[in-house]
């Protein structure tokens, strides 16, 4: 079970961030975290921590993601929330790629993505591959970025299109 007040605010926050309202997104995520913390419901807490990290990542807030990812990882490990554990590793890996630990970060993102694939949780596969490609582009590893982008399946079978525009932008940068 999960607290619907938390769930709705988090996904509304993600949507607002993509629509160009990052400050409103952050406020909704903060509300969700307050509800989750007050409920003392571990799954809602894990969801709130991890999805809030995504919003911080989308805002480019590397230090915040790096500083909060370990707490999300610890909570998810304690309660064996495999999906949110994998996402927390992916986000911490992204932060590492931005903080001069490129190789370690890429490895952590790949390991998180492998865990997601192993449990069939492919909802944010496109997003994760985009993070890998973006980190490679920033480090002038265009061939490696293209390899990650070629794994993205933007077809009718895959309904994960929320990151499609960013994937196309990244493809443009690799050429």
Go through each PLM region and give its residues.
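Short, flexible, glycine-rich and Lys/Arg-enriched loop motifs at helix boundaries
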Residues: 1-4
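Helix-coil-helix junctions within alpha-helical repeat/solenoid scaffolds
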Residues: 9-175
């Amino acid at each position: 079970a999960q607290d619907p007040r938390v769930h709705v605010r988090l996904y509304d926050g993600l949507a607002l961030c993509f629509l160009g309202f990052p400050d409103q997104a952050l406020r909704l995520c903060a509300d969700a975290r307050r509800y989750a913390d007050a409920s003392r419901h571990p799954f809602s807490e894990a969801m709130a921590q991890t999805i809030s990290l995504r919003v911080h990542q989308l805002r480019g807030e590397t230090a915040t993601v790096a500083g909060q990812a370990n707490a999300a990882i610890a909570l998810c490990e304690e309660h064996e929330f495999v999906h949110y554990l994998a996402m927390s590793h992916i986000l911490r890996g992204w932060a590492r790629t931005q903080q001069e630990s490129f190789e370690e970060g890429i490895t952590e993102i790949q390991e998180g993505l492998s865990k997601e694939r192993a449990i069939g949780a492919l909802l944010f596969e496109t997003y994760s591959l985009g993070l890998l490609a973006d980190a490679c582009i920033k480090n002038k590893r265009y061939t490696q970025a293209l390899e990650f982008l070629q794994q993205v399946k933007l077809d009718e079978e895959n309904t994960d299109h929320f990151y499609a525009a960013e994937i196309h932008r990244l493809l443009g940068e690799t050429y």
